Amino acid sequence: MLDKDLILNDNTCELSQISRHKTHVVEVGKVKIGGNNPVVVQSMALGVHIDADNIKSSAKHYAKEITELARTGSELVRIALNSEEVARAIPYIVEEINKEGFDGKILVGCGQYELDKLVQDYPDNIKMLGKIRINPGNIGFGDKRDEKFERVIEYAIMHDLPVRIGVNWGSLDKYLLQKLMDENSSLSNSRPSDVILRKALVMSALDSAKKAEEIGLNSNKIIISCKVSKVQDLILVYMALAKSSNYALHLGLTEAGMGNKGVVNTAAGLTYLLQNGIGDTIRASLTQRPGESRTNEVVVCQEILQSIGLRHFNPQVNSCPGCGRTSSDRFRILTEEVNGYIKTHMPMWKKKNPGVEHMNIAVMGCIVNGPGESKHANLGISLPGYGEKPVSAVYKNGKYFKTLQGDNVSEEFKAIIDNYVKKHYT
């Protein structure tokens, strides 16, 4: 039998009670990651081919995508440092995004095999970035690996750049993995290979971070990530990282997938970890459909954070899914129009009406749940369902406000929203 007092008094499900894992605070330009700072939304630019003979023009196109991501709400944008041309383009990219009102330090340079050479050949360009990312699995191999890793860390120290040590199971340090696999195979009770793989990921990240500190990089300049593609692996790896260190943690699947699959995988993994206080910055690594903007990965991250109450970005619209009681598409159309209205007006509201992002709006399709849901929102509207009178009841702050009817319900309700925002968020 259920304990009624436990149900009534237990506060463990209060979103405000999420206890964040204690991590070092890392400053990336004006953005603070870790500690009790808000979880930061990141994205990665797809990028463009940089024409060696027309660097400035190519940089302008690259900056356009970066600006679009930043304007959507990406607080940091990663770019691939994969060629000399990209390194040469950095000053022009920074110049272009500055023109649009964004700080060049939102840029995170992601280097792989070529990173060591690029920081040596273009030191003044790369120091314009806010952070660099090192993959311990492919910065170098054999005897060259430690040497190249050390040079990049020394460069970061010299220019006061934070570093994300980003381990990826698709490019994991093969020597470390082989060593652990050999050790495991010699045991009488050997563990499954996926357990060893997760262990290798965590060890690679923590050993690399420790090595960076030994070289002289402060712990408040280090962020760690361990990217995998399976949700359960992601959860287990990050729980181990959180248990073993206080480095700031970047969350994300390495390849989440396309469409609903990618969104669901990302939400499932990140929500569990964030709800348990793990994670200081996040990215949704979604495969976009051809021609589709990458801004969707920013929106997904924002929706995840807002859904669990960690951050608020836009007014929340709760809407009816529809059923046999709903008699038309009016509630669907109104929901779409309200969402569009919010999207159009948020840039202005953010400047003039602070706190509007906490607003809740309900758009319901019949009398069964319509009034009740509407009363839980700041503003709610209950449209008529099958067999109901052709009127729409509007509720404000939990109380009946007025009834709308006729052909202008949408415009009248949007006007009510606008008036509410102006009156309550100043």
From Swiss-Prot:
One GO MF term attached to the UniProt entry: iron ion binding
Catalytic activity: (2E)-4-hydroxy-3-methylbut-2-enyl diphosphate + oxidized [flavodoxin] + H2O + 2 H(+) = 2-C-methyl-D-erythritol 2,4-cyclic diphosphate + reduced [flavodoxin]
UniProt keyword list: 4Fe-4S, Iron, Iron-sulfur, Isoprene biosynthesis, Metal-binding, Oxidoreductase
UniProt remark on cofactor binding: Binds 1 [4Fe-4S] cluster.
Keyword Manganese attributed: no
Pfam families found in the cross-reference section: GcpE (PF04551)
UniProt-annotated binding residues for [4Fe-4S] cluster: 320, 323, 366, 373
GO biological process: isopentenyl diphosphate biosynthetic process, methylerythritol 4-phosphate pathway; terpenoid biosynthetic process
Cofactor dependence: [4Fe-4S] cluster
EC number in record: 1.17.7.3
Signal peptide residue numbers: none
Pathway where this protein functions: Isoprenoid biosynthesis; isopentenyl diphosphate biosynthesis via DXP pathway; isopentenyl diphosphate from 1-deoxy-D-xylulose 5-phosphate: step 5/6
Family: Belongs to the IspG family.
Function: Converts 2C-methyl-D-erythritol 2,4-cyclodiphosphate (ME-2,4cPP) into 1-hydroxy-2-methyl-2-(E)-butenyl 4-diphosphate.
PANTHER family linked: 4-HYDROXY-3-METHYLBUT-2-EN-1-YL DIPHOSPHATE SYNTHASE, 4-HYDROXY-3-METHYLBUT-2-EN-1-YL DIPHOSPHATE SYNTHASE (FERREDOXIN), CHLOROPLASTIC
Protein name: 4-hydroxy-3-methylbut-2-en-1-yl diphosphate synthase (flavodoxin)
Provenance organism: Wolbachia pipientis wMel
